[in-house]
Amino acid sequence: MKRLWDISPPVSADSPVFPGDTPYRQQWKWSLTPDCPVNVSEITLSPHIGAHADAPLHYENGAAAIGAVALEPFLGPCRVIHAIGCGPLILPEHLAHAQAGLPPRVLVRTARHAALQWWVDDFSAYAPQTIEWLAGRGVTLIGIDTPSIDPASSKTLDSHHAIRRHDMRVLENLRLDDVDEGDYELIALPLALVQADASPVRAVLRELA
């Protein structure tokens, strides 16, 4: 059996969220008793918690919700590239060493250990010119091990609008701590949420050989 790497952080009430966004909450609506045959919970959360896929609706009014987005970009050959210690922005030169034969999906690891217990503002993000550089090499999906492809302080979301122009897809909040640089199969399908601006994903990598 081919090896799997789970690259989705655990989701719980302790999961960090963007300041002001909705945290994970869970309460039990039904409990297993002699009069009730099941446990059933109610969950409230932002669709941007944990590993998730943004929809075009997230950064453009009237654009496609996540349930209308094609699934093909979220499944297939993928390259993990290490840019550990790259600083606030991932630049093309941080990825150039791994550009030969680039597959359509690229995930970038920026940290030795993803921040899973608390929110941090100074995470690494993609420079817009890096989106252009990747799009020019046929990349259709990008991912990152931080909460956003844009800096936390950004009000213009330049990298999000760069992927909009190129009709690219994005995965954020991945956990790549245990993943070596190299090629894998990505499986990270979003839910068919017909009105949502994003969806949680259970993202995994599978070895190719």
UniProtKB/Swiss-Prot annotation:
EC number of the protein: 3.5.1.9
The keyword Membrane is annotated on this UniProt entry: no
Role played: Catalyzes the hydrolysis of N-formyl-L-kynurenine to L-kynurenine, the second step in the kynurenine pathway of tryptophan degradation.
Keywords on record: Hydrolase, Metal-binding, Tryptophan catabolism, Zinc
Alphabetized InterPro entries for the sequence: KFase/CYL, KFase_sf, Kynurenine_formamidase_bac
Cofactor: Zn(2+)
Binding positions for Zn(2+) 1 per the UniProt entry: 48, 52, 54, 172
UniProt binding sites for Zn(2+) 2: 54, 160, 172
Annotated transmembrane regions: none
Binding site for substrate: 18
Origin species: Bordetella pertussis (strain Tohama I / ATCC BAA-589 / NCTC 13251)
Record's protein name: Kynurenine formamidase
A GO molecular-function descriptor: arylformamidase activity
Active site: 58
